[in-house]
From Swiss-Prot:
A Pfam family annotated for this UniProt entry: Photo_RC
Gene that encodes the chain: psbA1
Organism: Prochlorococcus marinus (strain MIT 9312)
E.C. number: 1.10.3.9
Binding, chlorophyll a PD1: 199
UniProt site (Tyrosine radical intermediate): 162
Name of the protein this chain belongs to: Photosystem II protein D1
Biological process per Gene Ontology, one example term: photosynthetic electron transport in photosystem II
Amino acid sequence: MTTIQQQRSSLLKGWPQFCEWVTSTNNRIYVGWFGVLMIPCLLAAAACFIVAFIAAPPVDIDGIREPVAGSFLYGNNIISGAVVPSSNAIGLHFYPIWEAATVDEWLYNGGPYQLVIFHFLIGISAYMGRQWELSYRLGMRPWICVAYSAPVSAAFAVFLVYPFGQGSFSDGMPLGISGTFNFMFVFQAEHNILMHPFHMAGVAGMFGGSLFSAMHGSLVTSSLIRETTETESQNYGYKFGQEEETYNIVAAHGYFGRLIFQYASFNNSRSLHFFLAVFPVVCVWLTSMGICTMAFNLNGFNFNQSVVDANGKIVPTWGDVLNRANLGMEVMHERNAHNFPLDLAAAESTTVALSAPAIG
């Protein structure tokens, strides 16, 4: 009894030291309580992803006994390779390795995909919490983790919400380059995402954010306060932690205000950097919301055959061109799982060709 109490007391003495180490901001890399969850989850996801990308056997993704190979050892390269999503025969069932009769069955049904995405989603969520935790420890404001929530929401949209809405993890995004593009093509074919306003906002956020980042960086670099000679690197003119400003915001404001017009230029550094952060973040949030709505088939705008002349004859538009492309992609994907896409199998015929030549 005495021995057991001594062991417990020694463990209790070590616990406060462990807590202090986990929450210490003096470590070279901050761990944090969220890090205790993040590190094993991301390591598990990375390890399974690497092994599956190299050596996983083909997966029966459509549930029709026609396996699709995605690994290096089965003939793929870095472009065509992927961790193939779990089988449509599994649907939305949670499919850990102990639910399969054998490891071979688990691999055949795409079990590694679920292992990777679940650990990955938990890991990046914990990483976001770790950002908040470190900001809290250092007395900083919490907006870093808020900005990071944009890519986190995108990951949850394509890996979790979309499969939930479609009824199967086989509809999730494959973990590979060509698999990602295949996912994008199929998404366009089935949901017309290019005509969804939230996707348009996301495109504006990505391209606009890149433009604003380049504009800001070039303006700052062009208005640095000279601290060095011509023979020295201008980077030597800045000392880490210096109090004085390293560039002339008045000069940058004056330049940009004259290049476009006065009120297009920020005269407040804080509001400028807030805008640089909030614009792409909000746009990516909107894109994630768009994916989540289209997951439940609330799709993009449909302008098929929407313009007619005085005689009621259809005047083809770019909406009809886009519809024709969508039908082509929809016919090609899962070609052995379905006879026709839903659009072609409908009672009313859909005009595919914009025009046909006269024969005879």
